[in-house]
């Protein structure tokens, strides 16, 4: 917005503020890294994210979309709704079918929940405010299996399980907080269904027609239709992943080991870790961290949990890590699981882009709650073990 003086006249046009922000941002990066290195790093990071992250996420979306459509077609979703409604309702304020989304994201990654959400029959169980909170719910379990298995491979077995419990607590906090934010902004979403009756009727007609076909044809059609929807989701997340992840990583990672910049992917100015080190006493009090370097894990997990896991062997080699840190890393790594790089794209694909700031705020708080819960649960475990 433009600034106004006492007479109501503009002091500076709106475009000037945009220009100042751009000049300051890229001027800072160019001064630290060198302009050619900065440009090369941005382009190469985005290119590597496209090839090794986006297409990986797209493959997850295709597979989980196919599985989800098969589960819907053959009645597993309806069965889960009846069986788990008493559990999911009081804890998460979500229908029982949501548990399928937790399983999908736990076995794969965050966008798997969107492949399910795009199925009208799955979405028909939700009110709008519940449907929107699916992004937060699914993200809290993203890449959970990978995180736990990786931690176990480093020789820690109990701590990751405590971290899993912490992630569940963070998920409850994030999901319910997001629902509260949505209802405060849009009270009418409390009664509006996520899917219109007309869309449900169309799906039921298609379902009746499908039931007349052989089991093999129904299986084939559901897999192909679900996979096709996964491709659409994978394409829709490209802008969010490339733009947000590149920004987060260039402010998180540092130069090469010799302190120089060469313009390769995943180099940066380490601004976020530098800021975090200024308040490392807060992280020690909240999470039980005894070394400021450990702050790099949660900061990196904001953009990509896979990248944060790569820090663990180095932490172990330097003797910075203990069971408490592993429990906290598991909780915050699962709960956040790179949500800054996927939340925008996921909400955009659901059609609620304007609610992205609320979702990010709720999930950021949920991740902190998960980490604090894991820290204190591990502390209690050490007292009784």
Task: Name the predicted role of every residue range.
Residues 112-177, 305-385:
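C-terminal transmembrane helix pair
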Residues 17-30, 61-68, 146, 164-180, ...:
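Hydrophobic core segments of alpha-helical transmembrane domains in multi-pass membrane transport
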Residues 1-13, 181-228:
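Intrinsically disordered, low-complexity non-transmembrane regions of multi-pass membrane transporters
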Residues 35, 43, 64, 69-81, ...:
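Transmembrane helical segments that form the transport core of multi-pass membrane transport proteins
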Residues 1-11, 46, 75-84, 101-118, ...:
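Hydrophobic alpha-helical transmembrane segments
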Residues 2-6, 10-72:
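N-terminal signal-anchor module of multipass membrane proteins
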Residues 4-19, 226-242, 355-363:
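Alpha-helical transmembrane segments and their helix-start/interface "positive-inside/aromatic belt" motifs
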